[in-house]
Amino acid sequence: MRAVRSLAILLPLALAVSCSSGEPSFEDAAAELQKDVQRLESHEFFKNPLLELRILQRGDKDIPCGEGGFRRVMRATANEDRDDDAVDSHLDRAQRLMENVLAQDFGYELALDPGQQDAQEGRFIQGEKKDAGLQVSAYVSPEKPTWRLQIMTACLSG
């Protein structure tokens, strides 16, 4: 009798653990993406109209991927005029600013690439919020627009 009771308690727990894949749900990832859109629009730096923040894709549409999966994608651009700054100085400043915003304000873990440190043609920033199922990539350009940002959810079952 005791074995039956133990089995009745342990079986649902074992099923719950085995059925959870460890990845976030599509709904949770999509909600976190929308929070990032709001964070970007209300960010102290990027809400300056001179930076010309443009949300090109809001991340509110399901895009089919994989077998029965979906993802959402947010794309945005912003610009900071270079004025008389040297290209390298402009890129250094813009890269540091975007890395700080993504890591400190948005909570992304960034993969730093020291090999592109003095690249005059632009810089790439990659990162993720693993627990939220989000990946970020940003391109820092010497030409307008300075920042090209993309955040997307992993391909998850809806």
Regions found by a protein language model. Name each.
Residues 1-8:
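Bacterial N-terminal signal peptides that target proteins for export
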Residues 6, 18-21, 25, 42, ...:
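Generic serine detector
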Residues 70-82, 147-153:
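Oligomerization/assembly interface segments of phage tail-like spikes and tubes
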Residues 85-154:
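Extracytosolic low-complexity repeat regions of secreted or lipid-anchored proteins
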